[in-house]
Amino acid sequence: MRRITEKLHITKVYVEDAEKLIPKLGGDVQIVSAECWEAVAFAALLALRSFERGTNHARTLGGELLIRLAGTLQIKDAIAQNGIKNGENYLVVFGTRERALELLREFGLNELPLTGCDEEKVKTFFEKAALAEVL
């Protein structure tokens, strides 16, 4: 599990039944599909910042994370592109490490090693996440 800030934690997980977990997501918890943890972390930080500044487009941090990660303001498109899927995903908890560990147990998820991207790919993800700032 990677601590991004005191109140933001990300870990890679394997999801066997995405449909079962969807009703449990939202608010301060989201599971997203993405190529690397850096993209997820950057989008999550932008989501937090948008709520602090009152410039958020979504009603929840989880929704804002999705639109930032996808680089679109259309939540349906963001969910289709980066929403939870069966297989490898990232659990994002806008809360304490203890809360994140509690959710791992509650959801029955096992942590996987975090996967990083090469520098050029990370830059591309950062640019896409920042798009929501100017849309």
Question: Can you say where each PLM-predicted feature lies in the sequence?
Answer:
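N-terminal interaction modules that seed assembly of large macromolecular complexes
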Residues: 3-59
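Generic structural hydrophobic/aromatic packing signal, biased to beta-strands
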Residues: 11-13, 31, 78, 91-93, ...
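Glycine-rich, aromatic-bearing surface loops/beta-hairpins
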Residues: 82-135
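Ordered, amphipathic secondary-structure segments that act as subunit-interaction surfaces
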Residues: 37-95
